[in-house]
Amino acid sequence: MKISQIEKKKHLYLIKLDNGDNLTVTEDTIIRFMLSKHMVIDSQQWEDIKSFAQFSYGKSKALGFIAFQQRSQKQVQDYLLKHQISPDLIPSIIDSLKQGKWIDDQQYVDTYVRQNSLTGDKGPLLLKQKLMLKGIASQLIEPVLAQTDFSSIAQKTAEKIYQKYQHKLPSKALTDKIIQGLLNKGFSYDLAKGIVSQLSLEQDSQHIEGLLDQEFDKLLRKYSRRYDGYQLKQKLYQALYRKGYDSDDITTKLNDYF
């Protein structure tokens, strides 16, 4: 067999043989086999060229995928499968990328956790969950999390929640909101409680009274359509208590109204 034509197609090359066969290859394939027009090749060489061309194409796709963003090994594997790279070739492509330090799950964890410490708001439980979803083994994740101080991240996250709800909720509900927000972000309950204890959540009575009045009016409109008398009073009390208002304040408000 003889190469009758080598035609460049963007970043790839189309090789045509005189027997009608053709193959799209990477530049690495051209260089590795020193391919040129009129070159004579036998059937075994052609099979070797095709095999390496698939490997090189897969590796090129992977490098494009990780060029601008660090990826985990599983992310790269999934990407290659999605782009119809042969599953038989993927392990060798991954090994080549690992040897070249293009993918390194331990480095991925280190960078991910460090970036969260600088600009993120996630606690260790959520970080671990997200990293494991990227296919990273827990034994690579846990030592890094254990060495990371999450108190400042939790403090910053708690303050953001406080700023958002301080004028909308009474102190008890505000405390619960901050703790739940921290738990949702993956911080431990003990750390969440400790952070909240450091915040100044006291509110003046006039502010609380204003919040209670607003909530009372809203709930009254809702429940007065279906209830009256004692039953209405009970529904209002229960709803206001669930929203974090003090029992004595609720009772006073209800007695004033009824």
Swiss-Prot record:
Coiled coil start-end: none
An annotated GO BP: regulation of DNA repair
GO CC terms: cytoplasm
Entry-linked InterPro entries: RecX_HTH_1st (IPR053926), RecX_HTH_2nd (IPR053924), RecX_HTH_3rd (IPR053925), Regulatory_RecX (IPR003783), WH-like_DNA-bd_sf (IPR036388)
Keyword Hydrolase: no
Gene3D superfamilies: Winged helix-like DNA-binding domain superfamily/Winged helix DNA-binding domain
Keywords (A to Z) from UniProt: Cytoplasm
Protein's cellular compartments: Cytoplasm
Main location: cytoplasm
Task performed by this protein: Modulates RecA activity.
UniProt record similarity statement: Belongs to the RecX family.
Annotated protein name in UniProt: Regulatory protein RecX
